[in-house]
Amino acid sequence: MFSKSYAVDPQHIDFQGVMDGLFYPFYFEWARHAYFSEEFGINLDQLFELGHMYVVLEYRMKFKKSVHRNETVVITCHVEKHEKPTRVNVVQKMFVDGVIAAEGNFVCTCMIKGRPSIPQVIKNLI
């Protein structure tokens, strides 16, 4: 399973000494973009220039444990089939010291000329 580690930015820590809930989706996004690039060879910036827009249509997140100052998070990613053929679920978990801090399901698609689509390289995995 794909994973990526990130040192928690001190600017993302609130007055209570924990990561502000607003930043969890950013860490998930950074890992998701790395996942598409490193696992599938999908460069989102280059494809955007060609008119391909990879978008999150919806997401659901569960907070399990607070992330604190000076911690490192490990984000895992994998794709699962969605009920609609033009979407995929990107299932992600955030770990701190091997314990789940948060988990999320991100429903994604690729818009090409205004139409939703899933690249074949991703379809092959689900």
State the predicted function of each range.
Residues 63-72, 80-126:
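HotDog/MaoC-like acyl-thioester-processing domains
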Residues 1-5, 23, 58, 72-74, ...:
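Intrinsic-disorder/low-complexity, polar/charged segments enriched in Ser/Thr/Lys/Arg/Asp/Glu/Gln
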Residues 48-76:
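Short hydrophobic interaction/assembly module
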Residues 1-56, 109-126:
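Hot-dog-fold acyl-thioester-processing enzymes
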